[in-house]
Amino acid sequence: VHYQTYDVTEMIQSENTFTIELADGFYSSKTGCFNKAKVFGYEPKIIAQLELVNEKDDIEIVGTDGSFLWSNDSEIRYADMKDGETVDSRMSATYTGTARVTEYQGIICADNNVPVIEKEQLINPRVVHCPDGNTVLDFGQNIAGYVEFTVTGAPGHKVSLICGEKLDDNGNFTIKNILLSGDYDTQRMQREEFI
């Protein structure tokens, strides 16, 4: 298992909450061209620590252990690296349980890849209104990253953000080129739903 290290100095305030959102990720999400799930394991786990260094170079470590509060009722209702994410903004984590500590017998070592950093922000995409009534935000290139937007609506309204690469022959958005079968009404491929 590889770990990554980030400098979070600028995020530290006088009072802080150490919150971790854990989803399947590479470990147990669907991967590859055959959309196979749980290739590396079934239960995602996490180990984390926050090292606080004061002016005298004294180090205080806050690490994950059995005292961490746990919740399965947050606004993130579904998350898969390939299939996307469902967010229900009516929900809020209650943190009524405590984390289960497990034993890991493998090797934990530093990640030998370049760090994940935000390289650029793509703003003001070209807006395309498709014949079928859908709206496409065209950034003009394939991207890897996250999407940030503001939307207003009444409780229970649903907004779907589906990431893809092309329009079909009729000028409508499609993800059939990246699905194995079916269409995006029944498949969750790269979909983010906000309720």
Please report, for each region that a protein language model flagged, where it lies by residue.
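Extracellular/oxidizing-compartment recognition motifs
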Residues: 1-195
